[in-house]
Each structure stands twice: as C-alpha cells, then as structure tokens.
Regions:
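Acidic, low-complexity, intrinsically disordered interaction modules
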Residues: 3-20
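Positively charged, low-complexity intrinsically disordered leader regions
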Residues: 34-83
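Active-site-proximal loop->helix
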Residues: 73-74, 97-140, 203, 220-226
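A short, small-residue-rich loop immediately preceding and capping a beta-strand
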Residues: 82-102, 106-114, 187-194
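Short, well-ordered alpha-helical microsegments
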Residues: 93-97, 120, 195-199, 256-262, ...
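Small/polar-residue-rich loop-to-helix segments that shape phosphate-bearing ligand pockets
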Residues: 116-184, 226-250
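Internal active-site segments that recognize and position negatively charged phosphoryl groups
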Residues: 175-181, 188-199
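Active-site/ligand-binding loops adjacent to catalytic centers
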Residues: 207-266, 286-302
Length: 302
C-alpha cells in the first residue's frame, strides 16, 4: 500500500547548484547557458506576469506548462534523424503533455514509459489522448523505469531519451534565457521535485533569494542550489486543501501547495513561478479503454 505521509524532510542543503560547473562563478554560468541558447527564441513568448495579492506570478497556466519552454530549446536543437522523444511519465506531472506539445511543433513522435496501475491517471490519459506511444511497466521505483526507458532509446538510432524532470543543459539554457527577460525579483518561490526549474532560475537571477517547496522527495547533493527548502508534509499524490489554493489555475498536487507559504502584500518584490494548470481531457472513455495493469515479470532483473 501507499504511504500517504512520506517523510521528505531530510534534504541535503549544501548550497551547491549542480548545473553550475565547479570552476564557474554564477555570472560565468549565466553567460555559458545564454551562449548555449543564443540561436533559440522562445516560441511561447515572454511569460505573462500577473500580480495577485501583492505577489508577481508567472502565469504559465496560460500555456501547456513551463516545461515547453526549456523543452523547445532542447528538442529544436536535436539532429534531423532523431524522430522520437523518450520520457518516463509518472502519474503526476506536466512533462508528458509539454513534451507532446513541443514534439508536435517539430514533427517528432513521443514514446512515454509509465508505471503500471489498476487505472491510468488524469495526466497519463491526457498524454495518450494527445497521441503518445506508450508502454506500462510494473516497477518498485521510478529510477527502475528510467533505466528501462533509457535502454529502449539506446537501442534505437532515431530515439532520444530525456531524463526525469527534463534534466538537460539545453533545457536549463532555455529556462535561463526566458527568465533573464523578466526583471529580477527580490525573492522567488516555486514548487520543486527534481529542482531543474529552481536551479535554472537561480542562474538567471543571481541576487534573488529562493525558497523551494519540496513536494515530491528528498533533495540530493547539488539539487537545491542556494534555495531554502520547505518540506511539504502532504504526499506528492495528495491534493492541497481548497482553501489554500491560489486564485488562478494550478496543479493542486504541485504549485497549489506553495501559495500558503508565500507572504502576501508584503513590501518585498516576491515572484511565484506557476508552472501550469490541469490539462484538459476530452474523451473520458480512455480511462476504461486503456489496460495499464501489468503483473511483475518473473525473475526480471530490476
């Protein structure tokens, strides 16, 4: 059974941003990523910022999700012969629909590996409706599924594997370039699972103070950068209480958990990065048509 009170409050807080090379200053890192993205223009435009209760909010709920930005920087740079993007889509997360959005723009297919369950999740159903190829695997933990997906991609010359959270330097470059077009705030709040977004924003805004609300798991070496972590006690799959949700569309298992921690109408310039909203599913019959249950493979090596 699932443990709904998973303790993820044993973060490694080392002040290190693993996306900044050990020999780089923050300024050099920023220059490095801006150079990486110099030929890329964000097709989704400068993020729309709306003030809510004295907080500047990046409203990426107006697009499929923030991951389309860095995702486009990566996918637009892939060689011609790559026609399939491979990714692991957990039950919760906008990466799948975001990759599909970008892949369509570049005429590429998407192969998603998903954890087996009795019934697919809303986010997985949206990916299937939007045309991904997919495989379900019974796994004990996400890293195992990452290995399966990477192996599948490695065996095919035309496939490109994207790690969980879209961890790739071109994705970071896209985040840095887009954020650099927004005036630097004093403080930044964002939801954090893998840390890709907060680390990219820290490079773009070297003087801002960062708070990461960790919603998914313990943060490992170099993942938090200089962000101060807040451990969200709710399990990743549990939704935030309605009364704590922000006054704009959000994912209630992700960004929805951050709003309650942000000081409202303070005298500080605080920015909150809202990565998206719930994707829309048009065909509800998908839930019953897709058989996502798999038994454990006998003697399968993990």
């Amino acid at each position: 059974g699932e443990n709904h009170h998973l303790a993820h409050n044993k973060h490694i807080i080392d002040g290190i941003n693993k996306d900044v090379g050990p020999l780089y200053t923050h300024e050099e890192a920023k220059d490095y990523y801006l150079e990486l993205a110099k030929d890329w223009e964000d097709p989704y435009g400068i993020p729309q910022i709306v003030e809510h209760e004295g907080v500047r909010v990046v409203r990426d709920d107006f697009i499929t999700g923030s991951k389309v930005r860095g995702g486009d920087c990566l996918i637009s740079s892939l060689p011609e012969h790559i026609d399939t993007i491979v990714y692991v889509q957990p039950r919760t997360g906008l990466a799948g629909v975001s990759i599909l959005d970008v892949a369509k723009r570049h005429n590429k297919k998407v192969m998603l590996f998903m954890p087996s369950s009795k019934r697919i999740s809303h986010h997985q159903a949206c990916c299937i409706e939007r045309g991904c190829d997919y495989e379900f695997h019974r796994i004990a933990a996400m890293p195992n599924l990452n290995l399966i997906a990477k192996k599948w991609a490695d065996q095919r010359k035309n496939a490109f594997f994207v790690p969980l959270g879209l961890k790739h330097e071109k994705v970071t470059a896209g985040i840095v370039k887009t954020a650099s077009r927004i005036p630097e705030p004093e403080e930044v709040y964002c939801a954090t699972s893998t840390g890709v977004l907060t680390r990219g924003l820290q490079i773009a805004w070297p003087n801002a103070k960062f708070t990461s609300v960790c919603v998914a798991r313990n943060m490992k070496d170099g993942e938090l950068g200089r962000a101060t972590p807040i451990s969200e006690p709710l399990a990743f799959t549990s939704s935030e209480k309605k009364e704590n949700l922000p006054p704009f569309p959000n994912i209630d298992t992700y960004d929805g958990k951050v709003w309650k921690y942000i000081p409202k109408n303070s005298d500080k310039d605080i920015l909150f990065w809202n990565v998206g909203k719930e994707p829309e599913l048009h065909d509800e019959t998908i839930y019953d048509r897709i058989d996502s249950y798999r038994d454990w493979k006998k003697n399968a090596a993990n």
